[in-house]
Amino acid sequence: MGKGAGRDKYEPTATSEHGTKKKKAKERDMDELKKEISMDDHKLSLDELHRKYGTDLSRGLTTARAAEILARDGPNTLTPPPTTPEWVKFCRQLFGGFSLLLWIGSLLCFLAYGITSVMEGEPNSDNLYLGVVLAAVVIITGCFSYYQEAKSSKIMESFKNMVPQQALVVRNGEKMSINAEGVVVGDLVEVKGGDRIPADLRIISAHGCKVDNSSLTGESEPQTRSPDFSNENPLETRNIAFFSTNCVEGTAVGIVISTGDRTVMGRIASLASGLEGGKTPIAMEIEHFIHLITGVAVFLGVSFFILSLILEYTWLEAVIFLIGIIVANVPEGLLATVTVCLTLTAKRMARKNCLVKNLEAVGTLGSTSTICSDKTGTLTQNRMTVAHMWFDNQIHEADTTENQSGASFDKSSATWLALSRIAGLCNRAVFQANQENVPILKRAVAGDASESALLKCIELCCGSVKEMRERYPKVVEIPFNSTNKYQLSIHKNANAGESRHLLVMKGAPERILDRCDSILIHGKVQPLDEEIKDAFQNAYLELGGLGERVLGFCHLALPDDQFPEGFQFDTDEVNFPVEKLCFVGLMSMIDPPRAAVPDAVGKCRSAGIKVIMVTGDHPITAKAIAKGVGIISDGNETVEDIAARLNIPVSQVNPRDAKACVVHGSDLKDMTSEQLDDILLHHTEIVFARTSPQQKLIIVEGCQRQGAIVAVTGDGVNDSPALKKADIGVAMGIAGSDVSKQAADMILLDDNFASIVTGVEEGRLIFDNLKKSIAYTLTSNIPEITPFLIFIIANIPLPLGTCTILCIDLGTDMVPAISLAYEQAESDIMKRQPRNPKTDKLVNERLISMAYGQIGMIQALGGFFTYFVIMAENGFLPSGLVGIRLQWDDRWINDVEDSYGQQWTFEQRKIVEFTCHTAFFVSIVVVQWADLIICKTRRNSVFQQGMKNKILIFGLFEETALAAFLSYCPGMDVALRMYPLKPTWWFCAFPYSLLIFLYDEIRKLIIRRNPGGWVERETYY
């Protein structure tokens, strides 16, 4: 419904050959897009770049040359995808699936009305009413569904918002600001902190430039950009900046190497908009159900058509019967019931932070068997936090919990005081203004992720960092850069008995240690010997192995005789020591798991759902988080773990021995789909790290090849192709990019993985409850059809009219059917294996046999019993009714005799007949009471389940009140031909109602006592 309706569906295939060619071409294009990005611009020297693009590296392109290229390549914009026109979407709601069945019913009614009006001149207008009502039902529910989904699917508009509006280019040696659309390949472009990158650039010079690539690669840390070629992979090299990512700080100059759809982001956009999502599982279920119902209807219709010809009815009468039976088989109220049930669940999920954009997704989520989850922000808190420190030669654990309820460490050590001072001073991050009342962890910080983690940690442990910085004013600093890999600052020190200047430094641990010759232990300076270096190395490896980002810290008190007050420090010609410093300690940071995630992953496991982590982050970090949240459970080893334990090379380990598996994106690149299938099949716990957007898509397709129903979570633009392809895409509401929200079917308003599990639970519950609603609704079909069949076979007066059937289907049955959507789960639905879409259908043969063959038959008996009682009370005994139909329905015969010889006029006979219709209708309501109560459960006893569902109790009262109103309201005899009943006639169907209840309770008892037995196999739906 809401998913990727591409252009191909609606274009008439002019010639099948032409159509096939187009399809092949489209498939070729999609395969091309799925391939990894290949380019060599990052490997070229500046001279080669100049030759390739003809750009003067100082003067840029000439205006004339830029105009030529613009004419050749077109503007630097993204092509919007072929969108489905709104009227097509609306028509799909009106004529798709179940609606089609009702339309056919409606047309058949008009046809029957037309035939009778030609034959009789003064036709019965029942068929006309029925046709109009059926059409109205379809139109109303169609509008309702369309309105629900009109809020979705505007993918490219959000891509448009990402296009930078202005770009600063150098042309003819002059800087000029132009519209980003006018940027061409070969242009020389300047960017500064705060700008969006206007196209894919090869950087030729940069000063402290960092870009935020998170929307593209999923890396949360800002990435340094410089002219150096640092990696074969263009996505990871330092000298390429990508279209629509943000420059966070610094400046850079680059040559444009691709524009518009040819950029990396453009390729992802084309990939996302070109993908077609398949049919949702619930749409397939409803299709299966329609086939079943239509099969039953046509079978009955044709059988009785032939039978009526054998019974010597005319051709036309037989056709009218055929139409009547097919229409009577259509459950008019069911379309509305299903739509309302799904909407109610969607509303309930919205209260639990799951916003469903596409109603059918509610059902899909329940049948999910694999969840491919992004790591950053979904499984983790999306904020770097200090996790461990190493000082005084031991590792201390910091508190990473969201509410600061975790571990604490000894803060009295003199070394910790020195370490916290360095972390606070050698740090450019600051809290934004006016946040005194906000909890420290929730405060907004200006600065990069690692520095803000240190800032919050020191603020929590040691009080105000702002005051600390005021006590030690900064004199000079050297910011972090990629060549020396450290950051250094010198501060005034007013503490008595200490030197006047304090030098503090932090950076990559091995680089910091190389600059030190002593170490601070328990506040005492000691020489740095081999033993301490080994201890440092072990701590560094241990913290790095936990997937944490480790920084080293050192300081030096500058001697007053060399550096008196007012000394002019020079950072260009460094005139102060940067060697022989005193090492203080390490601090390591990680983006920690969310508190609710391990529990949610555990729930998924017990529900038989496989959780796979797919992330752009490092394998070590990914594996650490996977272990932390339980995606890799305790005791399960990867191939590398087994190799390390047995001390053998990885190549000698049999991959089948390892339950868990961490796959690197570069390995995935060279895998065939068979190898990927092998991994997905034989490993229960899988982590994919360093993956590209195209690979996410390939992983989703791999899972779907195994027959899994896949849910994918993601927040970046890089996730949108996978979100679109998945059976259900789940985007993040807070951190998610607009694009990912458009591609998804569901949005998590709190970005929390645990909300997906709630969604799965709701989805499973609504699937169970829809079964119950459908079973309840279908049962009354039999007491509605059998009167018509007996009317044909036994030639008796019609026991139940068309108007009364409509009053049941669209009146009394609606609220009770919807109330079953509020029913609680019978058992722990999260302890079940996921539903197998091939075998466990929404409506299966067993449900049909229960509703039609068993409960429905008892209901029909109740109705006929009431009919015969009323006829007998009026003088027509059952034996006298058989074969009376032709006389009874002839308006010119006014002397039909009953069993006692009394004569009845046409008018009097019809009043008795319509009273019977009303009584039959009331009997169906009475037996539907019992049906509603037994449909509450499929296995448990009603006494176990209880009557806690208030809506259902209201439904019982509502249908009874409506039946009484229709029977006793003055004027109903004219409007709907319904007549008042004697109170005793209400009780005729009571025994049958009780029989239904007892029959079903005994059936369920046998199922519970004898699981897997014959009764369960034949009757458990």
Swiss-Prot record:
The chain crosses the membrane at residues 86-106, 130-150, 287-306, 319-336, 771-790, 801-821, 842-864, 917-936, 950-968, 984-1004. It comes from the Eukaryota. The active site is at D374. Phosphorylation on Tyr-10 modulates pumping activity. Residues 107-129, 307-318, 791-800, 865-916, 969-983 are extracellular. Its EC number is 7.2.2.13. This is Sodium/potassium-transporting ATPase subunit alpha-1. The gene is ATP1A1.
